[in-house]
């Protein structure tokens, strides 16, 4: 239940900032901050400084930021595709995220936990942190500023491209 609270409150409280401050900086900030907080949590964990309650509290804070960033990134990812392929793009992105985040990651973390070595679990934290920071940096470098723009301004529909000019499907 506490993790769900972090997941819920993050988008509710930070959501408006993604349209006022901008999606690109906010997605980058929330991803990089989540990664940094996960490293700090991992360090405390491997040193034996966390209890079940304090590690849960750390995760709630991490989920607060990560969920807000992921929610906006999901929307942004769907906006950058032309209308004609947007639904398929969303489906593929969602399926890939579910495969990695819902199936592969829990399996790998389960294997790390079974070793009963905090250092191995910490390694899993580092991999997760690296991926979050990489996502934030990727957004900074190649993200699209889509706030306060219509979907057609972000991604021109394929049907709007002129036929025969070589800039769209024939």
Question: Language-model segments: what does each one mean?
Answer:
Residues 1-170:
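Transmembrane-helix signature of 12-pass secondary carriers
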């Amino acid at each position: 239940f506490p993790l769900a609270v972090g997941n819920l409150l993050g988008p509710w409280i930070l959501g408006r900032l993604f349209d006022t401050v901008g999606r690109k900086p906010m997605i980058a900030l929330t991803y990089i901050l989540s990664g940094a907080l996960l490293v700090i949590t991992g360090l405390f964990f491997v040193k034996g400084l966390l209890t079940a309650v304090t590690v849960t509290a750390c995760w709630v804070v991490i989920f607060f930021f990560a969920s807000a960033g992921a929610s906006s990134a999901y929307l942004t990812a769907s906006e950058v595709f032309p209308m004609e392929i947007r639904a398929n793009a969303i489906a593929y992105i969602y399926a890939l995220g579910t495969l990695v985040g819902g199936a592969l990651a829990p399996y790998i973390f389960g294997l790390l936990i079974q070793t009963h070595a905090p250092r191995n679990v910490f390694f899993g934290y580092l991999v997760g942190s690296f991926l979050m920071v990489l996502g934030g940096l990727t957004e900074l470098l190649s993200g699209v500023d889509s706030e306060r723009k219509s979907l057609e301004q972000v991604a021109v529909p394929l049907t709007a491209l002129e036929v025969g000019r070589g800039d769209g499907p024939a």
